[in-house]
Each structure stands twice: as structure tokens, then as C-alpha cells.
Amino acid sequence: RKLKTGTASVAVALTVVGAGLASQTEVKANRADDARNEVLRGNLVRAELWYRQIQENDQLKLENKGLKTDLREKEEELQGLKDDVEKLTADAELQRLKNERHEEAELERLKSERHDHDKKEAERKALEDKLADKQEHLNGALRYINEKEAEAKEKEAEQKKLKEEKQISDASRQGLRRDLDASREAKKQVEKDLANLTAELDKVKEEKQISDASRQGLRRDLDASREAKKQVEKGLANLTAELDKVKEEKQISDASRQGLRRDLDASREAKKQVEKALEEANSKLAALEKLNKELEESKKLTEKEKAELQAKLEAEAKALKEQLAKQAEELAKLRAEKASDSQTPDAKPGNKAVPGKGQAPQAGTKPNQNKAPMKETKRQLPSTGETT
């Protein structure tokens, strides 16, 4: 564009120079014509003036010739300048085309660079979004890992606690098993004593059937026997209540160590009550033996009274046997429940007790091996004098 502007300026300048030369030549030619015309019109022009005029004309001719030469030179120069201008114009146009092509190429390059930049910017933004998403996933994974580690620690603590509780439970199970074995031995002894008591009562019935005591003495003996029977029944009822209490306490769920200790104490207390009931039964049997002796001393009853007394004694003995049989069934059932409890796995702490199931063993409990054995009573039969 600059080259084009300069070329146009040169062309304008050359045009102005050519126009000036042409106007100057025309002015000089006009002056010569005017002088000749003036001479021709004035016939009185002096010779000197004419000569001067001729010289001037010659001079003007020379000048005109020189001006023509200059004009040709100027025209040639102008033509050269025009050629140069055309050449410069062509070069400028070529350069302009080249520049335009260069500018188009530059524009295309800039467009390509802009496109690449936009593409890279989009890729960078996509990578940033992807990185943010990955970071979010990573944060979520870290949170999940932390939660799992916390859960693992909690489970490890729970397993450790369960392991300790299992050790305590195993120790308490062993202790309670020993106590249960001792309790079974005690129940066997109770059953044996009850069997002896039944045999003694049968013997008393036989002795009463053959006694010839007097009515008054027999009535006293009968009242005493009934009282003794009531005491025995009371003792058996206490024994039944204590055994029921033991069963109910066995049905309590896997409780704490203190609860198991209380249950064990209650079982021991029940055993003491059983021993006490046996002692009372022994004392009542001793009273019956004393009554039998008194019956032997008084033999004044009639056959009818003997039959009535025998019927009453048989009825009472039958009722007592039924009660003893029922008590034996309950003891057998209790033994079966305890045997099944010893085979079942320990319940977890905090669960409710299921009826009919035994309690979990208590840690630290000791078997009743050091307890004093049940007092073995010796009784002498009044009829034969045999000691049992």
C-alpha cells in the first residue's frame, strides 16, 4: 500500500512538470508571433529594432529549439518515468497480492492457532473437570476406607470382648457343671431318703394294722401321725417349692456374673431347705416310732376300729405315695432339663431366657464339693428293732 501511494505521487509530479514545460514553450512562441505582427503593422520600425528583433527571433528560435529538445528529453524522461511508474505499479500490485496472500496465510495460521488454542482450552477444561471428578471419587474412597477402618477396629474390639466373655463363660460353665453334678448327687440322696421315708411309712402302716392299742391311745397316735404326715407334706411342699424356684431361676436368660451368683446362692439355699426338710422328716419318723411304741403298749382296739384305722392309714399312705411319685417325676424332669442345658451352647449375654432352658454358667463360681454331705439318719423299726 505504501509503494502504491508513492508511485501515484511520482506520476502526479511528472504530469505537473510536463504541463509546465508545455505552457512555457507556448508563451515563448506567442511572444515571437506578437513581435512579428507588431513589426508588420508598424512599417516605421527602425532597422536597429528590426535587427534586434531578428536577433531576438533567432535567439527565441534557439531557445525554442532548446526547449523542444528539452521537451523531448522531458517527454522521454516522462515516458521513462511512466514506464517506471507502471513497473512500480505492477511491482506494487504484485507485492500487494503477495502481502494479501501473506495476510491470508497469516490469518489462516492465526485461525488455526486459535482453533488449536480453543481445542487445547477445551481439553484443559475437560481434564480439569475429569481431575475434579477423580478427586471427588478419591475423597469418597478415602472416606469409605476410613469408615471401613473404623468398623474393623470396632469389630476387633467386639471380637476381643466376645473372646474374653467366652473365656469367662467357659470357666463359669465348668464351675456350674461341678455344682450341677453336686446338686444331682444331692437330689439322688433326697430321692433315696424319700424312698426310705416311703418304706418307713409302709412299715408304720403294717405296724399300725397289727397294733392293739387302746382307742384313746390310738386316737392320740393317729392325730400325732396325721400331724407328722402334715409336717412331712409341708417339708415335701417346701422341697417342691424350692425345686420349682430352682427351675424358674434356671429359665432366666444368660445373665451377668452377679445374677448367676445369686442363682447359685438360691440353689444352695434350696439344698439347705431340702436338708432341713429331711431332718424334719427324720424327726417326724422318730415321733412316729415313738407313737408305734405307744401303740404296742395299748392293745385294746376292736376289730372294727382296727379296720377303720387301717383304711384311713392306707388312704393317707396312698395319697403320700402319689405325692412322692409326682415329686419324683418333677425331679426326673429337672435332671433331664439340666442334662440338656449342659449340652447346649452358651447363650450370648443380654438375651432373654427361654423357658425350660438352663442358665449359662457363672465365672468364678465354685462347686458345692466342699459342702457337708446330707446327714444320714438311722432309724430303728419298732416291730423288729432293726436299724435302717
Swiss-Prot record:
Residues 91-116 are annotated as: 2 X approximate tandem repeats, type a. It is found in: Secreted, Cell wall. GO terms for biological process: plasminogen activation. Residues 95-189, 204-231, 248-269, 331-388 are annotated as: Disordered. The modification Pentaglycyl murein peptidoglycan amidated threonine is found at residue 384. It comes from the Bacteria. Residues 85-113 are annotated as: Able to bind plasminogen. Changing residue 111 to A: 2-fold decrease in plasminogen binding. Residues 95-137, 145-168, 176-189, 218-231, 260-269, 331-340 have a biased composition (Basic and acidic residues). Belongs to the M protein family. PAM has more than one binding site for plasminogen; it is thought that each of the a-repeats can bind one plasminogen molecule. NCBIfam families: YSIRK_signal. This is Plasminogen-binding group A streptococcal M-like protein PAM. It comes from Streptococcus pyogenes. The gene is pam.
